[in-house]
Design a protein with these regions (language model features):
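Aromatic- and carboxylate-lined catalytic core of secreted/periplasmic carbohydrate-active enzymes
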Residues: 6-9, 74-119
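Beta-strand/beta-sandwich contexts
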Residues: 201-230, 273-286
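C-terminal beta-strand-rich structural cap/linker in extracellular carbohydrate-active enzymes
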Residues: 174-204
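Surface-exposed, short loops/turns at beta-strand junctions within beta-sandwich domains
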Residues: 257-262, 339-343
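Alpha-amylase-like alpha-glycosidases and glucanotransferases acting on alpha-linked glucans and related
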Residues: 1-53, 58, 62, 69, ...
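Carbohydrate-binding surface patches
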Residues: 115-153, 256
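Aromatic-rich carbohydrate-binding modules that target alpha-glucans
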Residues: 297-344, 352-369
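Short proline/glycine-enriched turn/loop motifs at strand-loop junctions of beta-rich domains
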Residues: 142, 152-157, 225-232, 297-302, ...
Length: 370
């Protein structure tokens, strides 16, 4: 799980926008497969503090256990099939960690660093600017672990478990050390979870997320983060955008009419301070869908892509081409692509191998009108 958090952080363009869940209406309820409440609570704490947007399936807070493992059995009618108790640990845990998500931007927007991992224990850290959260989880309900000298970006000092011992977490001490601070030994009893946090005031505009990440001129865009209040300006690349409204945590703006089509870095400027960059894909106009098809032989590790003369196809740059085509009936490949409507489009199919080596389709450019 720790490895997955790390590689998706590198592989996903917008990893903090991924919706995460323990269960849903299409799968077996988590309470059916995991009967230990200690492990159940540890999983819930992980869901609510790891990267992504957590999706809580109704009844999770009540430890619902259906009659069998089918997805249908899990779709209970709460009013008749379950009592509703606001004193369950799961209910209180969801509320407490949702509060932390609102309070500390490291959960919603932060990067992830794995500080310790074995088959039962995972310690990870989330960081966004100077906001830091350290989470230690023991999923094994009947075995304790002691981890010495855990590295952390938490400043030196004493830290209280944010959950107040709800999952038996204890307070920790962080000591200054050469290179990076470390904690004293952390002992985790069976099923124990500890959450420690440092919430810093924003000194510059900080972009945490943008919704959506793609649009055409005139589309409304929401920028989320911290330090976004006051007299600010927003740019898409080098083009300034109109700001409709702004607060400390949200800006409402629009894609500028003269923004350059393709990938633009959004920035927020406040006085002399400029925010971090956030990539936004400016479309070249109204869109429609074209499904591209090709019959092509490939070697192991090769995939087929499309590159063409419009920004949506990379403007002839193979590094900005489409995603790989699909091939459920190899050697037939296809891919639905959003392209500018009513436009003559020139394109080619290309092959890329695992090393990124590109082989261009021979012959004249293919031409369609969308």
């Amino acid at each position: 799980f720790g490895n997955m958090l790390q590689y998706t952080q590198d592989d996903y363009d917008y990893e903090n926008q991924a919706v995460t869940f323990l269960d849903n209406h299409d799968v077996t309820r988590f309470g059916y497969t995991q009967r230990s409440q200690k492990t159940y609570n540890a999983a819930l704490a992980t869901l609510l503090t790891s990267r992504g947007v957590p999706n809580i399936y109704y009844g999770t807070e009540q430890y619902v256990v259906p009659a069998d493992g089918s997805d249908v059995s899990g779709r209970i009618f709460m009013q008749t099939d379950s009592s509703f108790d606001t004193d369950t640990t799961a209910y209180k845990l969801i509320g407490k960690l949702s509060e932390l998500r609102q309070q500390n931007d490291a959960i919603a927007y932060g990067t992830t660093t794995i500080r310790y991992s074995n088959d039962d224990v995972l310690i990870y850290e989330r960081k966004f600017y100077d906001d830091v959260i350290l989470v230690a989880i023991n999923r094994q309900p009947d075995k304790a672990y002691t981890i010495d000298n855990v590295e952390t970006l938490l400043p030196e000092g004493e830290y209280v478990d944010f959950l107040g011992g709800m999952l038996n977490g204890e307070n920790i001490s962080v000591y200054a050390s050469t290179g990076i601070n470390t904690t004293a030994s952390i002992t985790l009893d069976g099923g124990e979870v500890g959450v420690w946090q440092y919430d810093a005031a924003a000194s510059t505009p900080e972009i945490g997320n943008v919704v959506s990440t793609m649009g055409r001129a005139g589309n409304r865009v929401y920028i989320y983060g911290d330090g976004l209040d006051g007299n600010i300006s927003v740019k898409f690349g080098e083009t300034e955008a109109t700001v409709e409204s702004n607060t400390a945590n949200e800006i409402v703006t629009y894609v500028p009419d003269n923004a350059v089509a393709g990938y633009n870095d959004i920035t927020v400027t406040k006085g002399d301070a400029v925010s971090n960059l956030f990539t936004y894909n400016v479309l070249s106009g109204d869109q429609n869908q074209v499904i591209f098809h090709v019959k092509a032989e490939t070697s192991y590790g090769e995939n087929i892509y499309i590159v063409g003369n419009v920004p949506e196809l990379g403007s002839w740059d193979p590094d900005k081409c489409t995603e790989a085509l699909l091939n459920p009936n190899y050697p037939e490949w296809f891919l639905p692509v959003s392209v500018p409507a009513g436009t003559e489009i020139q394109f080619k199919f290309i092959k890329k191998d695992a090393n990124g080596t590109v082989t261009w389709e021979s012959g004249d450019n293919r031409v369609i009108t969308s």
